[in-house]
């Protein structure tokens, strides 16, 4: 009978699907499918490309971490020394191997050591990479992001001081040196804080720290998501909002700064933005003799703050 494997003389071949032996364990299927796609060269253990990739990974692990967008790397011997003298809260001082130890390098290392700042000697190529090949003179100082206060914290600081609030808000100020100088003036004349917009404004960078001469470590700087809305809120809370502009309709001599006040400073070029100007209780100008049309923003802020401080002492 055809197909009867029990008949006499029949021989069963090994590996057939008939009888107790079923399947081949996938051998035939794998044989038909082949070995699949060839992996990339860098994933083949014995390929030169894989060896190069492994070597590069090991070198990357030994390198100092590249600074992120949130940190700042101050470069150059003079800027680094100035930041350290101003007590900028740095986290690491990078020194390129083979850097000549002149007076500035020696001072930077000494201040960093006395301040508990990590001192890392790295290959010059690593510092080149971290600085995007900018001129660093063998020194780099890593500065963490500034810890901004909330706008309400400025009012709380004034309340704790027991004096009428004296705040400064910046509008269209993009130069961090102006910001640092204003922070320094606010601290010098008894102010309680500085408010800056979250966008399109200078921020507290290492340059601002250095210009503030350390005042940024003592005076809170807050960021407002919407400057105009924050100023309105402060006005509703009893603060006088005083804009500072060369075209102001009130002179500084006429300003009464003895009560709670926030001085809004615009840039030398653009001045105050339209919405901010419209929401000021007064827009003040500084009387000047001679042909000078305007003052630098930080200088103008210092003049107004000095006058308010004089009034409060009287």
From Swiss-Prot:
UniProt entry tagged with the keyword tRNA processing: no
Classification via SUPFAM superfamilies: alpha/beta knot, L30e-like
Region annotation Disordered: where it falls in the sequence: 1-73
GO molecular function: RNA binding; RNA methyltransferase activity
Key words, A-Z: Methyltransferase, S-adenosyl-L-methionine, Transferase
PANTHER family: 23S RRNA (GUANOSINE-2'-O-)-METHYLTRANSFERASE RLMB
Protein name according to UniProt: Uncharacterized tRNA/rRNA methyltransferase Mjls_5122
Record organism: Mycobacterium sp. (strain JLS)
